[in-house]
Amino acid sequence: MIAEPAHFYLFGLICLCSGSRLRQEDFPPRIVEHPSDLIVSKGEPATLNCKAEGRPTPTIEWYKGGERVETDKDDPRSHRMLLPSGSLFFLRIVHGRKSRPDEGVYICVARNYLGEAVSHNASLEVAILRDDFRQNPSDVMVAVGEPAVMECQPPRGHPEPTISWKKDGSPLDDKDERITIRGGKLMITYTRKSDAGKYVCVGTNMVGERESEVAELTVLERPSFVKRPSNLAVTVDDSAEFKCEARGDPVPTVRWRKDDGELPKSRYEIRDDHTLKIRKVTAGDMGSYTCVAENMVGKAEASATLTVQEPPHFVVKPRDQVVALGRTVTFQCEATGNPQPAIFWRREGSQNLLFSYQPPQSSSRFSVSQTGDLTITNVQRSDVGYYICQTLNVAGSIITKAYLEVTDVIADRPPPVIRQGPVNQTVAVDGTLILSCVATGSPAPTILWRKDGVLVSTQDSRIKQLESGVLQIRYAKLGDTGRYTCTASTPSGEATWSAYIEVQEFGVPVQPPRPTDPNLIPSAPSKPEVTDVSKNTVTLSWQPNLNSGATPTSYIIEAFSHASGSSWQTAAENVKTETFAIKGLKPNAIYLFLVRAANAYGISDPSQISDPVKTQDVPPTSQGVDHKQVQRELGNVVLHLHNPTILSSSSVEVHWTVDQQSQYIQGYKILYRPSGASHGESEWLVFEVRTPTKNSVVIPDLRKGVNYEIKARPFFNEFQGADSEIKFAKTLEEAPSAPPRSVTVSKNDGNGTAILVTWQPPPEDTQNGMVQEYKVWCLGNETKYHINKTVDGSTFSVVIPSLVPGIRYSVEVAASTGAGPGVKSEPQFIQLDSHGNPVSPEDQVSLAQQISDVVRQPAFIAGIGAACWIILMVFSIWLYRHRKKRNGLTSTYAGIRKVPSFTFTPTVTYQRGGEAVSSGGRPGLLNISEPATQPWLADTWPNTGNNHNDCSINCCTAGNGNSDSNLTTYSRPADCIANYNNQLDNKQTNLMLPESTVYGDVDLSNKINEMKTFNSPNLKDGRFVNPSGQPTPYATTQLIQANLSNNMNNGAGDSSEKHWKPPGQQKPEVAPIQYNIMEQNKLNKDYRANDTIPPTIPYNQSYDQNTGGSYNSSDRGSSTSGSQGHKKGARTPKAPKQGGMNWADLLPPPPAHPPPHSNSEEYNMSVDESYDQEMPCPVPPAPMYLQQDELQEEEDERGPTPPVRGAASSPAAVSYSHQSTATLTPSPQEELQPMLQDCPEDLGHMPHPPDRRRQPVSPPPPPRPISPPHTYGYISGPLVSDMDTDAPEEEEDEADMEVAKMQTRRLLLRGLEQTPASSVGDLESSVTGSMINGWGSASEEDNISSGRSSVSSSDGSFFTDADFAQAVAAAAEYAGLKVARRQMQDAAGRRHFHASQCPRPTSPVSTDSNMSAVVIQKARPAKKQKHQPGHLRREAYADDLPPPPVPPPAIKSPTVQSKAQLEVRPVMVPKLASIEARTDRSSDRKGGSYKGREALDGRQVTDLRTNPSDPREAQEQPNDGKGRGTRQPKRDLPPAKTHLGQEDILPYCRPTFPTSNNPRDPSSSSSMSSRGSGSRQREQANVGRRNMAEMQVLGGFERGDENNEELEETES
């Protein structure tokens, strides 16, 4: 099986070997001829060659793009044929836009059985040539000689076509070197006229050729002149013709122009042959004229000069002169013409001519200067006669003559002097011109006036020359505008003064020629003194006259010399110093000088003429020098002056060349002067260059922006050569350095709101150039009122329209040159009234008047009225809401009638210390250390009791049983207000008591039985009685939150049927608890079914260690204090806003297993052992204590002591070690079950309560002043306005029945309810800012009165002393109630009576937002009394009893220091029974704790005198002896650590009051032992179902021996 395959393999191998031997000559194919790339035209045949060899002969196949090519072998109809040689032949190339089957890359493959061979790639491309040229050549137009370029881009094609050009249908000869074809561009470098023609671009490739569009080359010819104009010289009034002929292609246009100006209007014409003809040529027609030939290719110019030959005319004519014998005289003669005429002199009758270029002869006394002046020296009598001056040029000649008179004796008098000449003026048409000319001289000068060089004709009636020389022109016309010259002449010479006068049509006020105030013009300077003299220079000095006139700003120097003429010449001006060197004087000449001072207002009178001064003589020239030769050679010197170079605004550089030098050139004189019509023919200024080789110089100190004419002249000593030609140069401009003058602003008559602004240009020397424009700013008091105007430099007025009336505008004007605007003028103010008339400065109203005008505007009055109306409406709305809120509270009081346990006190807000103190609705302590915070009942409460004598009850007596008339009468049964005025005598400080009574009397006489607060079974004849029928002190009810009212109302209906049965067994004692009313009400509901009590419920408030105040940390809804009984007219400052917070949300959940509560039946106290009935009202300290061991005899001097209010508003400051004897009736909803437990006998045996921390609350405000030592009553019942005022007498029986029914109910002690302090957070806020239960007071007179009672209410007051409890007990005694006293036994076995104390709880309805909720508190059902005396049994409805609350964690608050030291003052503190009694009482209660709610009223037991560091020492501290009673002996207390931290929360225990021997620190947790108190209860059957509001439970009070002790309290 294995060998059989091997046979097969062997056989195959043999066959293979035998086959290879048979075909050894075969070889695989190879390509011999590869195909090549082809470019073929569409539709043309093509062949792709491919040749291969091999054995056997290989077969050839073609592939295109990787796919086999189909040939005729595959398809006979195919246009592709495979030739035998292997080549691929295309019959025609198929090529379309969408289908290109033949184009591509081909390969040929040769195969045989040995293999295959592949050729190279060969591409077959289809040649194309499109028809459209990518760029056709465009027409070109060039001038002869310019290059011409034609661009062409052939159409797209493959292969790329080549370009050639045709001209006029023939191929272009590119052999011409001027023609270049590159990249399709045809370029002809230098065109000729023969190159013009039509050109075509031709594109060619294998497909064919394409021709572009025809482009034409146009060759134009620039203009050229056939005949040019030539220079002409003609005389004046002749005609001048300039010929001009030009050619070009196209034919050029020909025009003429004058290089330096315009062609003379109406005197020239251009003929058809382009010839320019000027008729009546004038001298102004001289210049260069240019013929301009221009066509579309270019232009050509040809110029010619016209010279106008002007006959000479005299500029200065000689005048007759009188000269003394032997003197020198000069005749001036100056002429101009074109060319410059020659001047020569001759004496009439003589043929001898004297020329200016003639050298002077030493023997001759006659000479002619270069300027043409004839000078005769050493005049002789034979020189008398006429002398003729003649001028001559090619245009003509003129002559003039002057007479010389020679006298024997003649003074060398100067010419006259013009003291005051005319000034430039601008007047309105029909105005009057006054031109003054005051001249002095000897003899008196003759004054002549010329206008523009022509004598003014006086034949015109408008023109008159006065004798003084003044020229007066009335009714000025526009034609009177011109330059006026005053000439003053005498035989010795003349003086001239010119001014320019302009007459305008409108708006130019008449200006006086000189300022009317002479102090504005400088006075004449002093006589000039000569300090230095040279050949050509004289130096002068002078002093200004500062005694009168204004201070000069510059000076003008004038000089006179007979050698220079017969008139005064201005030698220098604008001289800034008092010393000046005058240059350019003639040698060997006598000169006189005078000086004038000048400022902006004018020129002063001339100074005195200086002494004559003679310049030095010319130094003699070298010997042998011929003067004639010097003059001749200087005359042949020719200077060529170049165009000056402008260097700056005040300097110019001048260059010149000398054509022919001379040895007699000593230097050059550069003469320059301002040119232009405005400057006139001013004198030439000379700048000498004494270096002959120098050919340039810089002329300094030129005026800015002025056009100067400059020329040069060679000189040699006194000899001078010919002048060069004149050149012009203009210095650079600068902004004017002075403002325009005489700026005026006036009302424009044409427009009601337009003004006219006029001005004069700045002084010429300050213009610093040509004024091109004036800028006018009209600025209002706001940007939107600004108006700017710009006018040209020749305009001196502008109208500014559209001014806003009432706006004060300031107008400023500034001149502007090419360098910019210059200095602004002084602002001119104008204001238009509502009628468009200018308001004078006197008429401009003051600011107060403007305000008054605004106030009188109807719109303003309407706006004020609308604002007042809005304010009134807002106030009305606020008042309505305020009253509505009060009415809402009043309507809520109606519910108080239904619930006897509700008490509410409206408030009056006072302002004390700059802050709001609200007494309404803010429960808290009454701090005697804070003055002026006592709340008052607003007198707006109606007093319905008309007979106060019947029912008024005076709380306190003055110690003798008489009522104090200074106190307000109260009429609330069983309530007492202590009169402390008689107790303090000299201890009342800072009292802010009102002058009159502010209490409202509430009349309860008509319907006392309807007063639900008193409608209890124990109410009899208007007095409260206990079950045994004895009158009992009234215990007020307590406020609760508004959110409890609904629950109370709902549970009132069935309250009588639901009885709570306390457990009979006694339960172990637990730690005292403390909580606030919110926690109590909230938590008791949850634990109503549970019979256990949490150990501690902290108060939700924090304590201030400085003030003893407490901070309220709850946020309860209440109404504002401002809505509760404000007194009319009382100012209620706004209380500071405090952020509200709902602190109830922060309370933790109750514990799962609260501790059990005490058995209330353990509470046993005799009601019979009560206070004595006669007790004077004590002075309440703050905090007030009830001291034990007071003498019984003190009770006889006191009035009834009201029950102690709840003083313990801060848990950290109070420890309750005595149980209160006040039995207060809580409502079912606020069953204070945890509070009805006994405190330990002594807190010293009680371990420290756990450290509690309080939540920080808002910081307290600054401390308040000390309160006065008066405590005012608080009404604890419904308002009189809410009661029926007509209670009948017949309802007394019903009251008796109710009293009988209530005897079966047990009296429950009111639980201690901590009052949340206000959000202000200090003690004052918890005292005056709280609404607390008030106390009424009963006087002895009311014991026998009817049931009527007048109820007075005071808001926010609070008793903080134990005397308040004594007052209540005394009131109960007065009312016929038997007050029980508890007999105690101390440690030594001694028995004594201990007065029961129970501080009145504070109100729970104060909130952080200073709101007081009106809460209807339901009466707690009276408890059934057991048979054993002294014990109380609780009887309540199961559904209404709340479970004990869970104690939340204590919240710690930061201690806030008081900002002011409170006043130290003595206070009256009642003494309590001895400590032994308390010890004994504590020992009696060790067996169990009381479960009753008798101890719910707490009191703060603090004494500011106590040292907080050692409570035991504080206990042993003796009385200071200031009390009225006898001090009790000191007793030792069991040692106990009773101090708690100031921030600790103390457990609740029934409060008592420390003795004077045992004061307590406010921060200490009191170590006093607690003492229970009970009420004597009698069993009463037939307890029916009653309204909860009618169930009042009265508390019994024990008698106690108490004394008042005066304590000093210090608060820091």
From Swiss-Prot:
> Is Cytoplasm found in the keyword set?
no
Extent of Polar residues compositional bias: 1098-1107, 1216-1230, 1399-1412, 1553-1562
**Residue ranges with Acidic residues bias:** 1283-1297, 1603-1612
Task of the protein? Receptor for SLIT1 and SLIT2 that mediates cellular responses to molecular guidance cues in cellular migration, including axonal navigation at the ventral midline of the neural tube and projection of axons to different regions during neuronal development. Interaction with the intracellular domain of FLRT3 mediates axon attraction towards cells expressing NTN1. In axon growth cones, the silencing of the attractive effect of NTN1 by SLIT2 may require the formation of a ROBO1-DCC complex.
State which residue ranges cross the membrane.
Answer: 859-879
Tell me how the protein is altered or processed after translation. Answer: Ubiquitinated. May be deubiquitinated by USP33.
- Biased composition, Pro residues: where in the chain? 1147-1157, 1257-1268, 1441-1451
| Effect ascribed to mutating I270T | Loss of expression in the kidney of homozygous mice. Mutant mice have severe urogenital defects, congenital heart defects and craniofacial abnormalities
Tell me the keywords, alphabetical order: Cell membrane, Cell projection, Chemotaxis, Developmental protein, Differentiation, Disulfide bond, Glycoprotein, Immunoglobulin domain, Membrane, Neurogenesis, Phosphoprotein, Receptor, Repeat, Signal, Transmembrane, Transmembrane helix, Ubl conjugation
Q: What Pfam families does its record include? A: fn3, I-set, Ig_3
Compositional bias (Low complexity): 1108-1124, 1345-1358, 1563-1575
Task: Report the leader peptide range.
Answer: 1-19
Question: SUPFAM superfamilies, per this entry?
Answer: Fibronectin type III, Immunoglobulin
* The protein's name in its UniProt record: Roundabout homolog 1
- Tissue expression per record: Detected in embryonic thalamus neurons (at protein level). Expressed in embryonal spinal cord. Expressed in embryonal lung, and in adult lung bronchial epithelial cells of large proximal airways.
